[in-house]
């Protein structure tokens, strides 16, 4: 059998895949003896998604040989949603062209997901000269995106010394969410210079859907530069988004 991988906590894994599936229809997952990885671009080429899950976050990780599998993300998401919070998730692939997905909880339920051919693109995650780094609670970011969506289709991020704010302006109203290090929601901020950039709210909304309220989210950005958003899965796994800026006239 090429691989058998076990993850304790089916819902956590499902939330992770659901977040990525909001932005991409299909993906090529690389399964190696070091872990699972995936890098893809959304169809509009506005967001790059990078996922790295090292073997250490799984309770069982057996891989006979390196393999890349193509998956329909919507189908994968719908199956994973059938897992309960405390279910054990088992992913297996044999010699046939399907992924076996098993939930073990009060019963043992097994799905077979056909694998698909996915074009593997050479995508680099660039190291950019960001001038601001902000660490905040997932709940704060999720609520800010919801607030901003009532006003506009774009949200501006502004970082200055010891202060981070998110603003949206419409034709008749506006909203501002401001945080300092005295607020529980802002965990850390590093600013080389006052930094401002705007981003599309529809993309931000998709990016934050799978983030838990207590999760720590790291945001890096520069003046009219892409935004990099990272959040960690069990300390060692990481999901990264790189979002192109909304350039203002």
From Swiss-Prot:
GO terms for biological process: leading strand elongation; regulation of DNA replication. CDD domains: PCNA (cd00577). Pfam families: PCNA_C, PCNA_N. Keywords: DNA replication, DNA-binding. It comes from the Archaea. PROSITE patterns: PCNA_1. One of its GO terms (molecular function) is DNA polymerase processivity factor activity. Homotrimer. The subunits circularize to form a toroid; DNA passes through its center. Replication factor C (RFC) is required to load the toroid on the DNA. PANTHER family: PROLIFERATING CELL NUCLEAR ANTIGEN. HAMAP family: DNApol_clamp_arch (MF_00317). Sliding clamp subunit that acts as a moving platform for DNA processing. Responsible for tethering the catalytic subunit of DNA polymerase and other proteins to DNA during high-speed replication. Belongs to the PCNA family. This is DNA polymerase sliding clamp. The gene is pcn.
């Amino acid at each position: 059998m090429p691989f058998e991988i076990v993850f304790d906590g089916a819902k956590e894994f499902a939330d992770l895949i659901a977040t990525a599936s909001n932005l991409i229809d299909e993906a090529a997952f690389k399964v190696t003896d070091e872990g699972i990885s995936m890098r893809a671009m959304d169809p509009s080429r506005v967001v790059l998604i990078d996922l790295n899950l090292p073997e250490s976050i799984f309770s069982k990780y057996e891989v006979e040989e390196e393999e890349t599998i193509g998956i329909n993300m919507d189908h994968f998401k719908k199956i994973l949603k059938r897992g309960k919070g405390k279910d054990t998730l088992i992913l297996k692939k044999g010699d046939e062209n399907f992924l076996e997905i098993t939930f073990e909880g009060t019963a043992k339920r097994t799905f077979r997901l056909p694998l698909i051919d996915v074009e593997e693109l050479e995508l680099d995650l660039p190291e950019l000269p960001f001038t601001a780094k902000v660490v905040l609670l997932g709940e704060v970011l999720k609520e800010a995106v919801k607030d901003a969506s009532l006003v506009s289709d774009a949200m501006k991020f502004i970082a200055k010394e010891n202060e981070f704010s998110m603003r949206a302006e419409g034709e008749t109203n506006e909203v501002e969410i401001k945080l300092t290090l005295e607020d529980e929601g802002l965990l850390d901020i590093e600013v080389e210079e006052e930094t401002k950039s705007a981003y599309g709210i529809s993309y931000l909304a998709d990016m934050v859907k799978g983030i838990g309220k207590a999760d720590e989210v790291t945001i890096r950005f520069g003046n009219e530069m892409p935004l990099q958003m990272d959040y960690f899965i069990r300390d060692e796994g990481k999901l990264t988004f790189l979002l192109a800026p909304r350039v203002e006239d």
